[in-house]
Each structure stands twice: as C-alpha cells, then as structure tokens.
Amino acid sequence: MKEVKEALFMNKGEGESSYAQNSSFTETVTSMTMPVLENAVETLFSKDFHLLQALNAVDLGCAAGPTTFTVISTIKKMMEKKCRELNCQTLELQVYLNDLPGNDFNTLFKGLSSKVVGNNCEEVSCYVVGVPGSFHGRLFPRNSLHLVHSCYSVHWLTQAPKGLTSKEGLALNKGKIYISKTSPPVVREAYLSQFHEDFTMFLNSRSQEVVPNGCMVLILRGRLSSDPSDMESCFTWELLAAAIAELVSQGLIDEDKLDTFNVPSYFPSLEEVKDIVERNGSFTIDHMEGFELDSPQMQENDKWVRGEKFATVARASTEPIISNQFGHEIMDKLYEKFTHIVISDLEAKIPKVTSIILVLSKIVG
C-alpha cells in the first residue's frame, strides 16, 4: 500500500467520476470567497510599494478543477485595477500551482492555457508554474511569497492519526473509517492531535516562505459544532464505512482492512483552528468565519438522481485514497453499494457543508 502522500489526489482525467467534472461545489465556495481574496490583494498593495513590479502567489492543493482558474483570474483582475489606479505601466504576476505529485497536472495545465494565461494583457503579464510536493513542508525560498491561497486542501492530513491500535494490536475504531458517534474518545483525540501537528507544520513552512506582511487566504472544510462526530463532519465517511462493511459481509473485503483504515482528513472547528494559529505565533488572524451551504444535490427533487449525483461527487474526491487501502478492482462494486446506501439514507436531508475561511498576515519581526 502506498503512503498517503502518494495516494492522496482527486480522480484524474475528465470522465464521469473525475474531479474535473465533479468540482462545481468547490468552485461555488471559491467564487463566494473571492471578495476576501480581492481584499487581500488590495491590502498587499497598500503595504508594500515593491508589489507594483511583481507579485508572487501560490495556490496550494490546487487539484485539477476550475477553482484555480478563478483564483488566478481574480488576482490578475485586481492587479489590473491597481495598475490603472496607480498609473503604472506594467505589473507581473507569478503563480505557482502546487499539489502532491499524484495530482493530474496534465488536465490542469491543458485547461489553464486557454482559460487564464492566453495572451498577456498590456497591464499584467501572468506566468504560471507547477510545483509538485507536500505543502506540509518547505516548497519555496525564504521570503519569496506575497500571497498564499488554498481551497479545500488544508484539512487533509499527512497520515492517518497515530495511536489508533491498542497495545495488543487491536483496532480502536473498529468498523469505522473516521470519527463516529461510536468511536471511543481516544479516536477523537488522535485526529485532533494529528491535525494540530500537520497544521503547525504547514504554518511553520509558510512562515519562512511568506514575506513580512504577506497574506494567506485559506478555505477548508470544518464544522460549527464542538462535536467532531456530528453528521456535518461525518456524513460521507459514515455511509462509505457502511458500504465497505456490506462488502466485508459478502466476503469481498477482509474485515481487518476495514478495521485498520482511518481516513487521513479532519474537519476542525473554528476554535481549534484559532487555537493552533495563536499557539504558532507566526501569523495574525485578520479575518475568520465559518459558513454553511446546502449540498448542490439537494436541488434535485428526485431522490434517485440526488443520490447518484452525491455518490459521483463523493467518488471523485475519495476513490484514490479508498482504493489504496481496499484495491482498485473492488471500487465499482463499492461505489455502487455506496450509491444505494446514499439513496436510502436520503429520505433524511443531506447535512449542510461547513467551510472555514481564514485570512492570515505574517507577523513582522
């Protein structure tokens, strides 16, 4: 089985279950938060006169969907606006697109050339470079980045939480793949501890790369509740665990594979994120809020259509890490079972999706 950093990516290509075809919700969230990004660019220009020449920005965990196009276009548009306001001749925008090496950079750049870069306008020249690697470590030289953006990536962990087996080697989260109502307290504690460790590494790395007064705009999946086992956090993972358990009962998956698998992801609360940032001490929090949106599948009146669409979207972002544990050959049966479970469960409403947006400025000195 591959390590998390080798198996964590969204479904590739442009097929029915690809991330490129199933990232409309992420695009909606990105578009909603663009005013915050626009304000961040505006603030950068008010802080540093040298930005009138060039701005270095990075989109961390960019995946291969259209969100990156929106981010680059927004930054470029704001720079063009500042160029006109300040009566400068030209500005340059250097954008780095980062994700783990398994990301579908081919699909990303194929769409990028026609949608964003194209012919550089007279006011802003835009240059785009791919940077494969883990954002939990260093990626760039010291004091080289003015702006960091990330959408729906920082909640992914470097590994499954440590300490989820007993001294006797027994699984402590038996039958589940994430925190659930039946998980013992040690599971919740292990997930928070792993997120604390990983997010601290993320902040430490960025604190060296971002210039003084530089800015980060981070959007991540989270929760408004203090309880990490609430359905707003666990809905998809609970139903996937149920689908896997069905295949275990049919003898298609070893029970041990289910009992020893824990998803390397954590949806934190606002308080948990705030505490980690403040403890780290490298950045000030300029803005922070949580907001809820209905799952787009809830717009469908037919529960069968609603369930199938929900399952397809979930497959686009979960299949690579799930297949790494349970095997590629079982994925069609697994997600078919998942779809049936989703449809039967959709007699109840799909929980709203909670996001956290965080704007951080690097502390000077």
Curated annotation (Swiss-Prot):
Give the function comment from the record: No detectable N-methyltransferase activity.
Q: Which domain of life is it from?
A: Eukaryota
Q: Which positions in this protein are listed as binding Mg(2+)? A: N173, D259, F261, N262
Report the EC code(s) recorded for this entry.
Answer: 2.1.1.159
What cofactor(s) does the depicted protein rely on? Answer: Mg(2+)
**InterPro entries the UniProt entry points to:** MeTrfase_7, MeTrfase_capping, SAM-dependent_MTases_sf
Instruction: Provide an example Pfam family for this protein.
Output: Methyltransf_7
Which keywords, in A-to-Z order, does the entry hold? Answer: Magnesium, Metal-binding, Methyltransferase, Transferase
- Record-given protein name: Probable 7-methylxanthine methyltransferase PCS2
Q: What's the record's note on cofactor binding?
A: Binds 1 Mg(2+) ion per subunit.
Provide the residue positions that the database annotates as binding S-adenosyl-L-homocysteine: Y19, C62, D99, L100, S134, F135
User: Record-annotated residues binding theobromine?
Assistant: T26, Y152, H155, W156, R221
- Site (Involved in substrate discrimination): give the residues: H149, R221, S265, V313, H328
Show the catalytic activity: 7-methylxanthine + S-adenosyl-L-methionine = theobromine + S-adenosyl-L-homocysteine + H(+)
Family, similarity comment: Belongs to the methyltransferase superfamily. Type-7 methyltransferase family.
GO term, biological process aspect, one: methylation
A GO molecular function for this record? Answer: metal ion binding
Mind telling me which Gene3D superfamilies this protein's record contains?
Methyltransferase, alpha-helical capping domain (1.10.1200.270), Vaccinia Virus protein VP39 (3.40.50.150)
Hydrolase keyword on record: no
